[in-house]
Amino acid sequence: MGETIADVYAESIDPEIYANNPAYSSLFTPYIHKQTIIADHVSVQCHIDLNGIDAVGSKFGNLNAHAGNFTSLCAPNCLPERLALVAYTVEYAFLHDDETDNAADQEALLLENKMLHQAINQSSMTSVSNRVSAKAQRKSEVQAKIAAEYLRLDPVFGEFFLKAWQTFTASVQDVRSLEFPSLDDYLEFRIVDAAADWTLYNFRWGSGITLTPEEEKIADPMSYVAYAELCLVNDLFSWDKEYDAHVKSNGEVPLVNAVHIVAVTQGLTHCAAKAVVQAEIRAHEERFCYLKEQYKATASPSDSILSWLKLLEHSMAGNWVWSLCVPRYFKVERNPYKDHLEKFGSEAVRVLTPEEHLRDSKQEINGTKEIELQEPKSNNTAESDVLAKYTSGYPTIDEPVLNPYTYINSLPSKNVRQTMIAALNSWYKVPVKSLLIIEGAVNFLHNSSLLLDDIQDGSVLRRGRPVAHQIFGVGQTINTATYLMNEALYLVQMLSPSAVLVYTDEMRNLQLGQGRDLHWSYHTHVPTPAQYISMVDGKTGGLFRLISRLMRSEATVNRDLDISQFATLLGRHFQIRDDYQNLQSDDYTKNKGFCDDLDEGKLSFPIILSMQSPGFSNTALSSVFKGSQKGETLSPEMKQYILEEITARGAFSQTKAVLRKLHIELLRLLMETEQKAGGIENWALRLLIMKLDLGDEKKKEAHKSDSAWKVNQRRAWKGSQKNGRPIDKACFLRAMEEASQK
């Protein structure tokens, strides 16, 4: 497989493009994807999405009229169904790199990467008011589109890839202030700074290549050599452009380039330093070939590793031939982006769009049929009730000073509600003043509910920290919570009378929903799934509907766009997922304690389903929950017993099936709402839905730390033989020089 992979989707490019060019001296033959038009389309689409159609071609990334698309050249065997996303992501990375490279001060650089990190992670977000400009809104949508699509196509890789992306953004803001005593020290960091590892992980996934942890470790030295070669080639061809930017900015734009490092550390002119970098490139390619042949000579070389090595060869050759005459580095007569847009039009390039089949609720998000759930019966309505239309009608009961608020507001947060506000503003275009009022009111209400929840549930931890009432006392915490409710109302009154009606309506829903939950837990009354979902619609869905209804009441466009059903289903998904994770997630154990819902005597969704399973006695479980109401903390052994009972009754599996059904319906409703909103795609909401999906819960692959590349560097250059003894890299370079002179 490793030797034939080039024949799947790749074809060789015309040798006339590079063979007679003295600047091309790679040992490898370049290929290009047969469907490179897909990569070209989405490269232009990224420009339109990010800056509008008039700005297409104002900056340069993938497209190269001379040799071809960067992604198509470096990943010529990318699976066609993944090529669009891979190329779109690389295009955005190019444009983001331009933003950071041109940042004339550290503060601007930090801001660019902070915004990217927040958009991907949807956490620690700054105020919504910082993201209401057209440019910021477009950028946020593009970032969310990328993240959501990876999570949709492959949740396990998507989570890993997004974490690797965050590592990349963090490294950029760190490395630019460092000095490097040698080229090897520089390359260790440059691999991450230039996103070489991140980009190749993307190409590997796109090409359908998977390595086990053991295979990854075997391939690491060869991967390092290839990554370093890619960085060196990039630095060599981009040197003139980067040096010009450095000079024009009077040194404010830093030089992060191998040519500069060699010149400084070895006391050479820039011309001589470029020659050294060229020699280093050849040395790394030679070393790659040597290590590859060594591996192929082992007893049973892995096809996966050989395929990965072939991809690395393609990437090295593709990067080189692309760099020969690319608009990013050199002036060209014609703009390939403008030419492509003129030839194909703006509609043709819109390749990366939401999946059309989601309009049919009977289909799964990934193209397979939806999980067939049992038709609801009179004694088991969980799966039908979960998609039922929301009906209001709760009676009123709302009672709403500042240290507990300051404390809980400082704790880490998933920022789901703030994310939702920013996302909905794509549709409603709420004035900034109103947007800030809504954001403040929702923040007050959310934190108020958390303070009261922790008291009412008897919680010990909140997000891994002590709960507020253990620090400030129960009385003060209650006083703060009620004060926050009043402050939220005070803010809402600044909007309009209709906004106040929305507030009071949803506060009724929220408080009665919470009251039902407390009543059931205290009296150990097991509700039906339908009753539970009705409670969730008030307790959790109320705040989501409050956001959507307040924003709709203040909207400047799409005032007839009602997303109450979407907000209600989002609340159901959020709460049922929280119930599941509390009993099954290691992260929840770390942040809240081991199955703390059991200590609280909370009758969560999996427990309700388990206690309604036919053929099982509930006597033991009921006794356990009655005991917890007397303040008895359950032992780990007792909790394990309960978990085993829930598992045996199939309640966890049924809960996951319900969550999956909600996930699919939320995505379908989102597409339906996007059409009603004039075709405005809301990728921030789509990303929020994807991040809430439990996925297949496969074991997540750990990302390498920066220091790991130093280890791989040593492994890559260890063991080369000359005259029967090991030699270091310097000797290896000298040996090459001697060989070239013979």
Swiss-Prot record:
Motif (DDXXD 2): 453-457
Motif window: NSE/DTE: 234-242
Cofactor: Mg(2+)
Binding-site residues, Mg(2+) 3: D453, D457
Binding site for isopentenyl diphosphate: K414, R417, H446, R463
InterPro entries: Isoprenoid_synthase_dom_sf, Polyprenyl_synt, Polyprenyl_synt_CS
UniProt GO BP: conidiogenone biosynthetic process
Pfam families: polyprenyl_synt, Terpene_syn_C_2
Record: residues binding Mg(2+) 2: D97
Keywords from the UniProt entry: Isoprene biosynthesis, Lyase, Magnesium, Metal-binding, Multifunctional enzyme, Repeat, Transferase
Description of how the protein assembles with itself and partners: Hexamer.
Function: Bifunctional terpene synthase; part of the gene cluster that mediates the biosynthesis of conidiogenone, a diterpene known to induce the conidiation. The bifunctional terpene synthase PrDS converts isopentenyl diphosphate (IPP) and dimethylallyl diphosphate (DMAPP) into deoxyconidiogenol. The C-terminal prenyltransferase (PT) domain of PrDS catalyzes formation of GGPP, whereas the N-terminal terpene cyclase (TC) domain catalyzes the cyclization of GGPP into deoxyconidiogenol. The cytochrome P450 monooxygenase PrP450 then catalyzes two rounds of oxidation to furnish conidiogenone.
Protein's name in the database: Conidiogenone synthase
Organism: Penicillium roqueforti (strain FM164)
Gene (name only): PrDS
